[in-house]
């Protein structure tokens, strides 16, 4: 495996901000998950359609 690809993969796993890459199990699986995407799904904004949400993937 080329070293640049290894670095990219290790950075993906360290960053933990790519739940689509890591798999669907990261989406709000447990309330104490420490990534922003899980936080967004576990603490939805009641005014979501009318106000911007800090974790909305846009």
UniProtKB/Swiss-Prot annotation:
Segments for region (Disordered): 27-58
Tissue note: Detected in cerebrospinal fluid (at protein level).
Entry keywords, A to Z: Mitochondrion, Nucleus
Feature: compositional bias, Pro residues: 46-58
Oligomeric form and interacting partners: Interacts with IMMT/mitofilin.
A Pfam family the protein falls into: SHMOOSE
GO cellular component: mitochondrion; nucleus
Protein name: Protein SHMOOSE
Protein's job: Increases neural cell metabolic activity and mitochondrial oxygen consumption rate.
Misc. comment: Shows elevated expression in Alzheimer disease patient brains and protects against cell death in vitro in neuronal cells stressed with oligomerized amyloid-beta protein 42.
């Amino acid at each position: 495996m080329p070293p640049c690809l290894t670095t990219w993969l290790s950075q993906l796993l360290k960053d933990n901000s790519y739940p689509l890459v890591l798999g669907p199990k990261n989406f709000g699986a447990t309330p104490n998950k420490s990534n922003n995407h899980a936080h967004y799904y576990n603490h939805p904004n009641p005014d979501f359609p009318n106000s911007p949400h800090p974790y909305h993937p846009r």
